[in-house]
Amino acid sequence: MSEMSYSIIVAEDDADDRLLLETAFRETGFDVHLVFAHNGVELLKLLTSPKRSFHPRVILLDLNMPKKDGRESLKELKQHPELKKIPVIIFTTTNNAAEISRCYDLGANTYVVKPDNYTDLLKVVNHLKNYWFETASVSEH
């Protein structure tokens, strides 16, 4: 499977953060199809649409979004028979032990605090590429 066939769905309400993520993926050479949802309602609608043309390898999920926040979305994802198998990475500015624990209890696969500078964001994207994609590809064979 080539990297080009990978899809990541990003649930993020902040336009600047979406643009930074898109730029970081491109700049690191991580050629992946990014699908953006602006809130939890849109995320679940995209994922459950019978016309969905992508199959995300990973979901990057912000916690603080309008309409349906990341916690509610995570809970619904993990209760859905098909969607519960997609790894969910919480990607948020919220950094406290109780929230991290709560997200793991709800079924998050990992929790990443958004870096406050672009250099660290590039490191996070490289980690995603190296761990969630290249490692998974080796184990698929």
Predicted segments, located by residue:
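Conserved acidic segment of CheY-like receiver
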Residues: 5-16, 21-25, 59
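Acidic, metal-coordinating helix/loop segments flanking the phosphotransfer/catalytic sites
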Residues: 36-58, 122
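Short, glycine/charged-rich "phosphate-handling" switch motifs in NTP-dependent
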Residues: 109
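Receiver (REC) domain active-site loop signature in two-component systems and cognate sites
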Residues: 65
